[in-house]
A protein has these predicted regions:
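Structured extracytoplasmic
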Residues: 20-167, 174-181, 185-201, 205-267
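Hydrophobic h-region of N-terminal signal peptides that target proteins for export
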Residues: 10-21
Length: 267
């Protein structure tokens, strides 16, 4: 089983206009600092909330796609941690996602941890990569990389696990500086883990929670290639997001930045 883990980030939508002297792509470092500050400030404003998460899992071998299954879990975002429960359970606990979904490729962090980790001070290195269009928005792009010594990205396959470096790209709306999309790639995985590479994309959209609008990673894709060349793809979507109620029972433990777990695919 392949499991991927990283950090939590969901962003409130823009509610005020920017000043006329907002940094522009001609000053990419100043613009990056404004994006970073905006992202981290919004994280602090995010209420605790819970969503129904639907995961369609597919497998490709020798060019042919096979739909494996659809997995549904309840996920709560509380204090910038992801807590999981099976549908129908009344109790959220801080437990690894592969304890809730014990078979196949699974991950957490897409709806929180990754962006929080990337925009933490002194974790990722950024490089301005120009302007363009992405997912219907006029965007500014930055590429980033997180070295091994600063990474908390955990890859777990069968009985093996390892922390790995990763890299990727961030696209923000050129007018609002709201996140549009985040892609990340894991390429340098030790051979004994049994996974050649991992890639993930997160797509952001404004959603209403508790009477206010927030920018959430409404859907994501998680792909992984194992040492046999089999490619697993998870299509993940958040539904029915709502404010987390205090009468839910929550157990806290040690937080993690994000992870991926992958078991050898079953057909």
């Amino acid at each position: 089983m392949l499991s991927v883990t990283n950090a939590l980030a969901v962003l409130p939508a823009l509610v005020a206009a920017f000043a006329a002297d907002r940094p522009t792509p001609e000053d990419p470092e100043a613009l990056l600092q404004q994006i970073r500050g905006r992202t981290t400030a919004h994280l602090a404003q995010l209420p605790n909330y819970t969503c129904h998460e639907v995961i369609d899992r597919l497998l490709r071998r020798r060019g042919a796609w096979n739909r494996l299954d659809t997995v549904e879990v309840e996920v709560a975002f509380v204090g910038q941690q992801e807590l999981f429960a099976r549908p129908g359970e009344e109790r959220f606990e801080e437990r690894r996602i592969d304890r809730v979904v014990p078979h196949g490729t699974i991950g957490n962090g897409a709806f929180g941890a990754h962006i929080g980790a990337v925009f933490s001070q002194d974790v990722a290195g950024f490089k301005y990569a120009g302007t363009g269009k992405k997912d219907g928005h006029r965007t500014v792009r930055y590429d980033f990389s997180v070295p091994l010594e600063k990474s908390r990205f955990l890859v777990r396959h069968a009985a093996n696990e390892v922390i790995v470096p990763y890299e990727g790209s961030v696209w923000v709306d050129a007018n609002t500086l709201d996140l549009v999309r985040v892609d990340l790639h894991v390429k340098h995985i030790p051979s004994h883990i049994g996974v050649r590479g991992i890639e993930e994309s997160m797509h952001y959209k404004v959603m209403r929670i508790g009477g206010a609008e927030f920018l959430l990673p409404r859907k994501s894709e998680l792909g992984a290639t194992d040492d046999t060349g089999a490619y697993s793809l998870n299509l993940v979507e958040l539904r029915n997001c709502r404010e987390f109620k205090a009468d839910s029972i929550v157990k806290y433990g040690t937080s993690s930045e994000g992870s991926a777990t992958r078991e050898s695919p079953q057909q």
